[in-house]
Amino acid sequence: MRIELLNTPPDASETRIEEQIRPLRMDAFAGQQRLTDNLRVFISAAKMRGEALDHVLLSGPPGLGKTTLAYIIASEMGSSIKSTSGPLLDKAGNLAGLLTGLQKGDVLFIDEIHRMPPTVEEYLYSAMEDFRIDIMLDSGPSARAVQLRIEPFTLVGATTRSGLLTSPLRARFGINSRFDYYAPELLEGIIRRASTILGIGIDAEAASEIAGRSRGTPRIANRLLRRARDFAQVDGESFISRSIAMKTLDCLEIDEEGLDDMDKKIMETIVNKFNGGPVGIASLAVSVGEEQDTIEEVYEPYLIQAGYLTRTTRGRVATRQALIRFSTASERDEISLFDAQPTS
């Protein structure tokens, strides 16, 4: 499988490690069983017909394996893959250059596809349906459209916010797959596999501790494993024990539920500064010093999943569970007193 990376990663060393850990075949991909079982059928059928796989939309929170699965799809199809992201496709010419360079059966992977400009997105419609693109030459009275044929290809789009996709684009994906958070038991297996690849041992209790605080997310599990490896090596250990894992998690300020410093800051702000909400995302972002998109895409999905936060039309609201955990001591006493009062 030939791979072309069209975007520069922010941290090359971390990316190289992730590529080492990343499975290359469907059989090695852990979790998302129903999703992968269906994809196996679709891929096998496409290969039997000698056709390109239908276009695939992968949605879900970050770090669950959407990019990994895009590469596996290309590998299983025996195709080359070109990889880019929505923000990089800021001009129609960039997209046209990619599409005209595709060979028959190639996979074009667009990460963060919801961030493509609408004017560029429109060029995808005819490309996905009819394998052609229409380009306007010149302008004014001399303007004319030129139609370019492109080879049949598979577009794999990944998004953390499928609700931001336009209806015309979403309708053109024949396969729509959503990722769910991973159970701790599955993450333990991912951690053990990654530790073998990284060349460091890990005991069952250490793997369990890391998995339990990884927010159901393989990317976070692998990142915590690498940090635990750092602590082990600095301490002169060749093995990640439970004590090393606990030291790592404590130093990184990650609690038993996987909440980090920013998670707690968000919830404490909603509970104590905004009296539990509702609070608008713009006000919340300013209060905690974080970008709105980051809060919505990275932090909120897990806080909602964990039962601490709800979204309403008026803004973000802390749940009762959050009020009990993140309120000040006096406010917690008031909540407990209220709960203890008999009802008439």
Swiss-Prot record:
Q: Where is this region: Small ATPAse domain (RuvB-S)?
A: 183-253
Q: Where is this region: Large ATPase domain (RuvB-L)?
A: 1-182
- Give the top-rank taxon of the lineage listed in the UniProt record for this protein: Bacteria
Residues involved in DNA binding? R311, R316
Q: Give the start-end ranges of region Head domain (RuvB-H).
A: 256-344
Database matches in SMART domains: AAA
Q: Which UniProt keywords apply?
A: ATP-binding, Cytoplasm, DNA damage, DNA recombination, DNA repair, DNA-binding, Hydrolase, Nucleotide-binding
Q: List the GO cellular component terms.
A: cytoplasm; Holliday junction resolvase complex
Annotated EC: 3.6.4.-
Instruction: Name the major location.
Output: cytoplasm
- Catalytic activity line of the entry: ATP + H2O = ADP + phosphate + H(+)
Instruction: State the function annotated in the UniProt record.
Output: The RuvA-RuvB-RuvC complex processes Holliday junction (HJ) DNA during genetic recombination and DNA repair, while the RuvA-RuvB complex plays an important role in the rescue of blocked DNA replication forks via replication fork reversal (RFR). RuvA specifically binds to HJ cruciform DNA, conferring on it an open structure. The RuvB hexamer acts as an ATP-dependent pump, pulling dsDNA into and through the RuvAB complex. RuvB forms 2 homohexamers on either side of HJ DNA bound by 1 or 2 RuvA tetramers; 4 subunits per hexamer contact DNA at a time.
Question: What's in the domain note?
Answer: Has 3 domains, the large (RuvB-L) and small ATPase (RuvB-S) domains and the C-terminal head (RuvB-H) domain. The head domain binds DNA, while the ATPase domains jointly bind ATP, ADP or are empty depending on the state of the subunit in the translocation cycle. During a single DNA translocation step the structure of each domain remains the same, but their relative positions change.
Tell me which family the UniProt entry assigns to this protein.
Belongs to the RuvB family.
Supply the name of the protein.
Holliday junction branch migration complex subunit RuvB
Q: Could you read off the lineage of the organism from its UniProt record?
A: Bacteria, Pseudomonadati, Chlorobiota, Chlorobiia, Chlorobiales
